[in-house]
Structures are given as structure tokens and as C-alpha cells.
């Protein structure tokens, strides 16, 4: 049950789904003082998810905290594809090795809990990795920049490498909703001049880390998918693009053929 006074304050602040948000805030608060604190934070523009402390993703609640990138529903496509490719690894191959790069709070790694895979996740944010530890307790976490964060023992062993690297062009960041622009780290949003700087870096070294037949999955946008797959093809990967209109997801896929040198 939502509080009409909370609804009115949220609506005045521009919250489109004021009644739904009010009900969530009321349910989360254990006292009137805490409810007031939560409402003040939301009215000030903080994302609802970090106010509540969780985001729903593929049917589970993931821990989020102020200052982290909040997983979007469109990233469910990336997580589903990662799980599908993990399950497709031949049984005689041994445990599949999966890496979530630029993991943030590790939505992909969290989706692989129980998949009987060796899962690694890396990010440049210690705060995000703190959340990732709760969301993906079975994963090995690594702090650092892209491949520099990974143990060298993974070279040539990765069956699935998934990344939701930032892909907003630098000159479009200012146009993003204030919940993202003002409350999420710029490093998790800004993808460089054309939005795919990190995609190029991920693709350039992927063949060295992927096992023969391993796949690189990068979330992108329909308008940038050609740039992302182009970077993969330049690195010797065979590519295609998958989309899901229901969640608004777009994933570029690159496969390492057996003959690509590491």
C-alpha cells in the first residue's frame, strides 16, 4: 500500500511511476524516520534502485549501492546468452571458464550461480566489486583495468567472455537522464568519441584469452553494433549480432576459431 503523501512528493519531483515507487519505499522502511530519509533521497534524484539497495534482474534481487552502475533490464540478454554458451560447452571439456569483464555489481556472474562453471568477474571499482561479492559469491573477483585484472592462468582458457562495457558516446553523456548522469560513475557510462573505445580494447586481446571456439559477448546498441563487430572481426573473430526487442537488448558475438593464434 502506497502512502498518498509520499506519492504526491514523488510525483511533484517528476517520478513517472510515483505510486509504484511509493509502495516500494514504504515496504522498505522500518520506521517513519527511515521512510522520510528514503523519500528525500529519491526526490533529490538518486536512482530508486540505490535508494532501495537492490535491483531486480532475471528474477533475483541484486545488491546495489550509491556510486555504482545499476544493471538495466536490457543486460538480461547478455546474461542469458552467457548462460546459453556456458551450457553449450561440451561435457568432456571440463568446467566451463567464464569471465564477466567491466562487471559492476556482476549481474552476469550472478546469473551463472549454480551453473557449475569457473566464473571470474573484474571491474575498476572496488565499491562495485563489494556488491558483486554478495551477488555472485562463487565467483573469483579481480580489481583492475580489463585484461590487466585477470590472472595469467586464464590465457587461452576462457570459454565465455561477457562484457557490458560503457558505450555512450562522450558527447551524449550530458543528454542521459539525471539518475544516471549525476549518480552513476562516468567511467561506467562514457564509451569515448563513438562509444566503442572499450569494445575495441576488449576485442583486440580477446583471441589470446579465449579458448578455441570461445565466445566474446559485448552489449552494444543497434546503431553501434557494426562498430563493435568490426572490432571483433579485425581481431580475427567470426561475428554476429543478437537482439531482444522485449528487453531492448543488443549483443555482439565474436567466436574464436581454432586457428586464431593466441
Regions found by a protein language model. Name each.
Residues 19-85:
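Conserved AdoMet
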Residues 139, 167-197:
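Mobile active-site "lid"/loop adjacent to the S-adenosyl-L-methionine
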Residues 257-262:
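Flexible, glycine-/basic-rich loop-and-beta segments that form/coincide
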Residues 74-175, 223:
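Conserved SAM/SAH cofactor-binding pocket of Class I
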Residues 25, 45, 75, 108, ...:
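Residue-level signal for inorganic ion chemistry
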Residues 60, 94-97, 214:
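Nucleotide donor/acceptor-binding cores
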Residues 1-16:
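Non-catalytic nucleic-acid substrate-recognition regions in nucleic-acid-modifying enzymes
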Residues 193-254:
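Conserved Class I SAM-dependent methyltransferase catalytic core
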Amino acid at each position: 500500500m502506497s502512502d498518498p503523501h509520499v506519492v504526491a512528493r514523488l510525483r511533484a519531483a517528476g517520478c513517472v511511476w510515483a505510486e509504484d515507487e511509493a509502495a516500494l519505499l514504504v515496504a522498505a522502511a522500518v520506521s517513519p524516520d527511515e521512510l522520510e530519509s528514503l523519500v528525500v533521497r529519491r526526490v533529490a534524484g538518486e536512482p530508486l534502485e540505490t535508494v532501495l539497495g537492490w535491483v531486480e534482474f532475471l528474477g533475483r534481487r541484486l545488491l546495489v549501492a550509491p556510486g555504482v552502475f545499476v544493471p538495466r533490464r536490457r543486460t538480461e540478454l547478455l546474461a542469458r546468452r552467457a548462460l546459453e554458451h556456458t551450457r553449450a560447452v561440451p561435457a568432456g571439456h571440463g568446467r566451463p571458464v567464464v569471465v564477466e569483464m567491466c562487471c559492476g555489481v556482476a549481474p552476469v556472474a550472478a546469473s551463472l550461480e549454480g551453473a557449475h562453471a569457473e566464473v571470474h568477474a573484474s571491474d575498476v571499482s572496488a565499491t562495485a566489486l563489494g556488491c558483486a561479492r554478495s551477488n555472485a559469491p562463487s565467483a573469483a573477483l579481480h580489481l583492475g583495468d580489463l585484461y590487466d585484472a585477470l590472472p595469467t592462468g586464464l590465457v587461452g582458457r576462457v570459454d565465455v567472455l561477457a562484457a557490458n562495457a560503457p558505450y555512450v558516446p562522450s558527447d551524449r553523456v550530458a543528454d542521459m537522464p539525471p539518475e544516471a548522469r549525476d549518480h552513476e560513475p562516468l567511467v561506467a557510462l562514457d564509451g569515448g568519441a563513438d562509444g566503442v573505445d572499450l569494445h575495441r580494447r576488449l576485442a583486440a586481446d580477446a583471441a589470446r584469452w579465449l579458448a578455441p571456439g570461445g565466445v566474446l559477448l559485448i552489449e552494444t546498441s543497434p546503431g553501434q553494433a557494426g562498430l563493435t563487430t568490426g572490432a571483433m572481426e579485425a581481431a580475427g573473430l567470426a561475428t554476429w549480432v543478437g537482439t531482444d526487442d522485449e528487453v531492448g537488448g543488443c549483443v555482439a558475438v565474436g567466436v574464436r576459431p581454432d586457428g586464431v593464434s593466441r
